[in-house]
């Protein structure tokens, strides 16, 4: 994310999203009734062309709309914001509806009552764009699962079988193994950034040696760590361990996973935790909240009612973490009601 300009007297921030992660952040920053300004395509009636008067022609115009619907489309790499037009050229009626498709590298101006957590989220998105992307390969000698670590969750890129078998002789197994390594490398070679190989056994070390010999330009990006499990269980183990943070410089998804894990640990021992809106509000009455955790879904559905609570947490110097429901930790928090808190001291 690039923050181009801040205009505090008008509550406007001009910015440029640079990738899918930035669009996801924006989908949680832009709320109904916010004003969005951008260059967009609009079909307008061409009164001088009778043949096309029924459809009009598309042209690029600078419009402002008051947001009503905000939809993040991961598969199409865009964020769609729909609402009534509040600023337009003279030939486009104010109050008519329009949808602005926000895509990477489109400059957008957002006008809203900016909260502290909105600004923090923008700054976080700006910082994350400077960090290397991380691909995680959870593997052993028989299978590899490949994942891309994003700000809002994990994307599974591929699942590859080795073809190694006890039924094959040594030479055939060696051929199958090298073919397996080649398939893995072909699946990750287009991604810039760090590549973490993890899993039980020696598969991770063997492929590191193979890359050092055959793909020397890729070798400096390779990191190897042990894990007790394969597949998604192995990925969960890696996220909880903090290894991603060492590579990435604190990945959002790793941070969220670790804080939810801490919450579950406190709940299991009836320690410094509260979950559910009633329990959390009660903790706030005692100024006991150290860290407030909300899922993005909960905040979206209850923003107006929960903003007072968030402001109160900030007033006692508490932390606020908004957790994505696109990964397992977010789903666990959702199962607890979507809102929880880590406490400074126990309360009755």
Curated annotation (Swiss-Prot):
Give the matching Pfam families.
eRF1_1 (PF03463), eRF1_3 (PF03465)
Which Enzyme Commission number(s) are listed? 3.1.-.-
The parts of the chain that form a coiled coil are none
Q: Which InterPro entries match?
A: eFR1_2_sf (IPR042226), eRF1_1_Pelota (IPR005140), eRF1_3 (IPR005142), Pelota/DOM34_N (IPR038069), Pelota_arc (IPR023521), Ribosomal_eL30-like_sf (IPR029064), Transl-rel_pelota (IPR004405)
Q: What is known of its domains?
A: The N-terminal domain has the RNA-binding Sm fold. It harbors the endoribonuclease activity.
Which family would the database say this protein is a member of?
Belongs to the eukaryotic release factor 1 family. Pelota subfamily.
Give the record's keywords alphabetically: Cytoplasm, Endonuclease, Hydrolase, Metal-binding, Nuclease
| The name this protein goes by in its record | Protein pelota homolog
The disulfide bonds in this chain are: none
Organism domain of life: Archaea
**Which GO BP terms apply?**
nonfunctional rRNA decay; nuclear-transcribed mRNA catabolic process, no-go decay; nuclear-transcribed mRNA catabolic process, non-stop decay; ribosome disassembly; RNA surveillance
The top of its lineage is:
Archaea, Methanobacteriati, Methanobacteriota, Methanomada group, Methanococci
Q: Give the location in the cell.
A: Cytoplasm
